[in-house]
Regions:
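Soluble extramembrane regions of membrane proteins in the secretory/endomembrane system
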Residues: 1-37
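A general, composition-driven signal for non-globular sequence regions
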Residues: 5, 19-21, 26, 60, ...
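Non-transmembrane, membrane-proximal soluble domains of secreted or membrane proteins
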Residues: 10, 37-73, 93-274
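Alpha-helical transmembrane segments
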Residues: 71-96
């Protein structure tokens, strides 16, 4: 675990450069005098997830597809059960409705039926648990070898992003720091360490790091350093959202995830070191 830097260390403004390989417009960060940490107007320009059918498009080459498959499998199972139960209710309402001359019948239960509707859901739940555990292990297990290390320190109301410099170590003079701007190359795993540092390094609160298109959501808990990983399938610019209410400015705690070619990412790193 690394020591969380004070929020005052992160004072940056933005300028736009173009990734020549992909044509993607990305944000480069440069130091500026200490002032307002986050421009409210920037929240209006953050790309929103595009919804196709039930979910935004999956851009994760790792576990995103498996998460979607679980969602749809559970949706189909619960839909079949819902339709079956509602159909049975309607059938019984019609078949056993009150009619002139009809006598009510009484039953003390049916052991066979009791076993069936107890064991069947139990089998379904065990089956879903096994499938979910496999996906959970892939998400929460160790990140793939060669993953790019990045640290993100959450505060009210910004994502402070930190990359190691040429020495490969964090919290040294050559670190690269940005605010609300996460840059990664396409097709390469990224390991992100999440911490909550609080405003000006004081009174950290709970946040939640959310990348809808990558099926990644992780609570950022004060006092804990939590690792997550993901891998992008294509270039583009996407939203970094906080999905946990963290104060009155929660609505503007949004950032950019810029994904570009390996050449473009290296050009961006070079731009930061210049």
């Amino acid at each position: 675990m690394s020591d969380a830097p004070a929020a005052a260390d992160f004072k940056f403004s933005s300028k736009e450069i173009v990734d020549e390989a992909s044509g993607l417009k990305i944000k480069a960060s440069e130091p500026k005098p200490a002032g307002k940490l986050f421009d409210d107007s920037a929240a209006l320009n953050v790309p929103r997830p595009k919804m196709y059918w039930w979910l935004p498009p999956n851009l994760s080459t790792g576990y995103g597809r498996k998460i979607d498959q679980l969602f749809y499998l559970i949706l189909w199972i619960t839909s079949v059960i819902f339709v079956g139960v509602q159909g049975a209710l309607l059938l019984f309402l019609f078949r056993y409705r009150a009619r002139p001359g009809a006598k009510a019948t009484y039953t003390h239960g049916n052991n066979r039926l009791e076993i069936i509707w107890t064991v069947t859901p139990a089998i379904i739940l065990v089956f879903l648990t096994i499938l979910s555990q496999n996906v959970w292990s892939q998400i929460k297990g160790s990140s793939p070898s060669g993953a790019i290390p990045i640290e993100i320190h959450a505060e009210q109301f910004a994502w402070n992003v930190q990359y190691p410099g040429p020495d490969g170590k964090f919290n040294t003079a050559d670190d690269i720091k940005t605010i609300n701007q996460l840059h990664i190359p396409v097709g390469k795993p990224v390991r992100v360490r999440l911490t909550s540092i609080g405003k000006d390094g004081k009174h950290p609160v709970l946040h939640s790091f959310f990348l809808p298109e990558f099926r990644l959501r992780q609570d950022v808990v004060p006092g804990m350093a939590i690792d997550v990983w993901f891998e992008a399938a294509r270039t583009g610019q996407y939203e970094i959202a906080c999905s946990q209410f963290c104060g009155l400015g929660h609505y503007r705690m949004r950032g950019y995830l810029s994904i570009h070619s390996q050449e473009g990412f290296e050009a961006w790193l070079k731009e930061q070191k210049a």
